[in-house]
Amino acid sequence: MEIKAPSTQHATCVDIKGSGVLIVGDSGSGKSGLAIGLIALGASLVADDQCEILIENDKLHVSKPKSLPECIEMRGIGLVSVSTVSRTQLKWVVDMDRVAEERMPEFKFTDISGYRVPTIFAKNMDDLAFRIYVVACNELSEF
């Protein structure tokens, strides 16, 4: 997957202790659901459904378009106000449309205007919010 910056993307983003996690996928793939799980664990919402990706000081950042409310859509409930931050430094991409085929996969990356962002293929992954939260708070190890 390749994304250009600056741009507005159909995605959801949360901040976990200073690490921005951009959640991408088709409509109905579970982007907002994952974000809700991460918020329940302590993450803050950056933006739901649309995210502005920009380069500032040679780093990728994500912010909420000014036209969007500071809330998240909960299917079957409606729009709910949650804890938000105005922007975050992008550290991870979670791809809700792609399956991690291997138990211990090689590192995957998403190219965003020449920046390689570590990417987790998350379709059909159990306990997804817990896994993403732990990864965002720590580092992956290469053996």
Regions found by a protein language model. Give the residues of each.
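Extreme N-terminal, non-catalytic leader segments
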Residues: 1-19, 24, 56, 134-138, ...
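Short solvent-exposed loop/turn micro-motifs enriched in small/polar/acidic residues
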Residues: 5-7, 46, 102-103
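Short, acidic/polar N-cap/turn motifs at the starts of alpha helices
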Residues: 11-13, 50, 107
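Glycine-rich phosphate-binding P-loop
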Residues: 17-39
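A contiguous binding-surface segment within folded domains or other stable secondary-structure elements
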Residues: 32, 54-58, 133
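Short active-site oxyanion
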Residues: 41-43, 116-117
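Conserved nucleotide-sensing/catalytic segment adjacent to the nucleotide-binding pocket
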Residues: 44-98
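Conserved NTP phosphate-binding and transfer environment spanning the P-loop NTPase/kinase superfamily
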Residues: 86-143
